[in-house]
From Swiss-Prot:
Tagged with keyword Transmembrane helix: no
GO cellular component assignments: cytoplasm
Positions of phosphoenolpyruvate binding: 20, 92, 120, 167, 344, 386
Localization terms from the record: Cytoplasm
Residues bound to 3-phosphoshikimate: 20-21, 25, 165, 167, 313, 340
Catalytic activity: 3-phosphoshikimate + phosphoenolpyruvate = 5-O-(1-carboxyvinyl)-3-phosphoshikimate + phosphate
E.C. number(s) listed in UniProt: 2.5.1.19
Gene: aroA
Protein name: 3-phosphoshikimate 1-carboxyvinyltransferase
Source species of the chain: Bacillus cytotoxicus (strain DSM 22905 / CIP 110041 / 391-98 / NVH 391-98)
Keyword terms: Amino-acid biosynthesis, Aromatic amino acid biosynthesis, Cytoplasm, Transferase
Length: 424
């Protein structure tokens, strides 16, 4: 539980912790690569630590010293049948991408997670993997955990994904690494492309044409060095705080600027935020840079279409941003929010209403009315890290103290979030 009341502006410089998506992939790809992989600025959140724990159970030696991680790759054929179940905790990325990897290995695994994972849909991954010859079972015919999988003898497929999901795309591509022939995934909209970028960094040939990605089976990954940029989804909370808390100016260092993830920057700029991006670097792998944001006069906008996959995780904090804009903001085409750690359409609306916000849920998003004053109150993260952090930023503009129940959920992706907020 956290009790927050803020009566002054937010000013200072913050180094954003490592990107969660990239940290997951660095460990997974390093585990199935040949040779050693060294990862710096690894995110020490609970989700990424679950990935390390699972691959250790698969026989991979992984050393960790602070934010530096060394993975001694086994190659895909070197993974070992685990003696116990693989527990992914709260991590949807871990379970879905790991299913793709395990589709290649001829042994049995059982995968479980926490209560939240037990409610999240898995057939979007298990169905295409079954088409590729993986043997998968689970509750409701593989829709929910626990799941069991036995892989081997994978064949490439051309899969037209009904959803723009990097997790679905990645699972299929990873299954195709040792598959027979070519594996191709086409999405309705482009999702984040960290898997494609990292496969190339590990020496794999990946072809990308528009929203279609393909690779030929039989390729091996070669260990490498990965420097993880800061997570723009974590930075988003401080970007919004800087824009809406009076008398604020925040500099965020080393923020990932992958074009498939920068929807939050586009939204802030369209709403009129005073924002600058400097010192862009590392563009050949994962671009990153420094972002400065300050208190701004904002205008409500409509958010939807191809922008949604580029900011799906930032929608809770964008909803808060919209409460301080002039006019109405409409978020649409965001049905995917319903199958996140919580139904984020419902939880965002429910919790912001407790702070006096006028906001409406729709079937695929929400309508947020602007120029609102927030009041203090008791709110709940629902065990969802992004809801918890959004509510913490909301407390900075509330008239009165805000008590956040289950605030420890933020440790999933941002263990030192409250410390950094207090430092400003």
């Amino acid at each position: 539980m956290a009790n927050i009341r803020r009566e002054k502006g937010l000013n200072g410089t913050i180094a954003i912790p490592g990107d969660k998506s990239i940290s997951h992939r660095a460990v997974m790809f390093g585990a199935i690569a040949e040779g050693t992989t060294k990862v710096s600025n690894f995110l020490l959140g609970e989700d990424c630590l679950s990935t390390i724990a699972c691959f250790r159970k698969l026989g991979v030696k992984i050393d960790q010293s602070g934010n530096d991680v060394t993975i001694y790759g086994k190659g895909l054929t070197g993974l070992q049948e685990p003696k116990e179940v693989l527990d992914v905790g709260n991590s949807g990325t871990t379970i879905r991408l790991m299913l793709g990897i395990l589709a290649n290995v001829p042994f049995h695994c059982t995968i479980i997670g926490d209560d939240s994972i037990g409610k999240r849909p898995m057939k979007r991954v298990t169905d295409p993997l079954r088409e590729m010859n993986a043997q998968i079972d689970g509750r409701e015919d593989g829709q929910y955990t626990p799941l069991s999988i036995r892989g081997g003898n994978i064949k490439g497929i051309h899969y037209d994904s009904p959803v723009a999901s990097a997790q679905v795309k990645s699972a299929i591509l990873l299954a195709g690494l040792k598959g027979e022939g070519v594996t191709t995934v086409t999405e309705p909209l482009q999702s984040r492309d960290h898997t494609e970028r990292m496969l190339r960094a590990f020496g794999c040939t990946v072809e990308v044409t528009g929203q279609t990605v393909s690779l030929r089976g039989g390729q091996s990954l070669i260990g490498t060095e990965i420097e993880v940029p800061g997570d723009i989804s974590s930075a988003a909370f401080f970007l919004v705080a800087g824009a809406i808390v009076p008398n604020s100016k925040i500099v965020l260092k080393n923020v990932g600027l992958n074009p498939t993830r920068t929807g939050i920057i586009d939204v802030l700029q369209k709403m009129g935020a005073i924002l600058s991006v400097d010192h862009v670097r590392n563009e050949e792998f994962e671009p990153c840079g420094d972002i400065t944001i300050e208190t701004s006069k904002l205008q409500g906008i409509e958010i939807g279409g191809s922008l949604i996959p580029r900011l799906i995780d930032e929608i809770p904090i964008i909803a808060l941003l919209a409460t301080q804009a002039t006019g109405t903001t409409v978020i649409k085409d965001a049905e995917e929010l319903k199958v996140k750690e919580t139904n984020r359409i419902d939880t965002v609306v429910q919790e912001l209403k407790k702070l006096g916000v006028k906001i409406e849920a729709t079937s695929d998003g929400m309508i947020i009315y602007g120029n609102q004053k927030l009041q203090g109150g008791i709110v709940d993260s629902h065990g969802d890290h992004r809801i918890g952090m959004m509510l913490a930023i909301a407390s900075c503009i509330a008239d009165g103290e805000v008590e956040i129940q289950r605030s420890d959920a933020v440790s999933v992706s941002y263990p030192n979030f409250f410390d950094q907020l207090a430092s400003l």
